[in-house]
Curated annotation (Swiss-Prot):
Co-factor: note: Binds 1 zinc ion per subunit.
GO molecular function terms listed in the Swiss-Prot or TrEMBL record: magnesium ion binding; RNA endonuclease activity; rRNA binding
The protein's name: Endoribonuclease Nob1
Kinase found in the keyword field: no
Record region (Zinc ribbon): 128-159
Gene responsible for this protein: nob1
GO cellular component: preribosome, small subunit precursor
Keywords: Endonuclease, Hydrolase, Manganese, Metal-binding, Nuclease, Ribosome biogenesis, RNA-binding, rRNA-binding, Toxin-antitoxin system, Zinc
Function in brief: Toxic component of a type II toxin-antitoxin (TA) system. Processes pre-16S-rRNA at its 3' end (the D-site) to yield the mature 3' end.
Domain called PINc: residue spans: 5-106
Phylogenetic classification of the source organism: Archaea, Methanobacteriati, Methanobacteriota, Archaeoglobi, Archaeoglobales
Length: 166
């Protein structure tokens, strides 16, 4: 199979009407988010393919998002956009995920998916997020600390990964 450059498009690219690539694909969940008339018109005149993401890739994305700590920041649509990018990579295509969403970019980086921002600078480092107790500072999994009963907050774990090649 011939390697093709494919741009997987997040809804932000459609809302900004900045998706101007030759080979564009998105998922049905993104199409469902298009509510304004200008974006709907833009979407209808561009040559988008709309395809489902595979359940296997959805699970891979969820696992990666759990590892980075972004799982609670991603919508089902975000997860499926990332999964579609993985599907295209598995087909042997050269993939660029087009999004301004930093959580999507972070998970994409952890999965080795190239990405481009639309209006905002893209991330250059991968971040890991963890829940910690607001009261005692312990790392926890739940929303309430089982030790002291305080609420969880999300904190970034510092690291120096700089792996985006896009």
């Amino acid at each position: 199979m011939k390697c093709v450059e494919v741009h997987v498009i997040d809804s932000s690219a459609i809302f900004q009407r900045k998706a101007v690539y030759r080979n564009m694909v998105t998922v049905p969940e993104v199409v469902a988010e298009i509510l304004d008339e200008a974006s709907a018109l833009y979407f209808s005149v561009k040559n988008f393919r709309v395809e489902e993401a595979s359940p296997e890739s959805v699970e891979e994305v969820k696992e990666a998002a759990r590892k980075t700590g972004d799982i609670h920041k991603l919508s089902d649509t975000d997860i499926k956009v990332l999964a579609k990018a993985l599907d295209e990579i598995k087909k042997g295509n050269e993939v660029v995920l087009v999004t301004d969403d930093y959580a999507i970019q972070n998970v994409a980086m952890s999965l080795g998916i190239r990405f481009d921002g639309i209006l905002h600078r893209q991330i250059s480092k991968e971040f890991k997020w963890v829940k910690v107790c607001r009261g005692c500072g312990r790392r926890i999994e739940s929303e309430i600390c089982p030790v002291c009963g305080s609420e969880a907050i999300i904190r970034r774990v510092k690291n120096d990964k700089n792996r985006n090649s896009g």
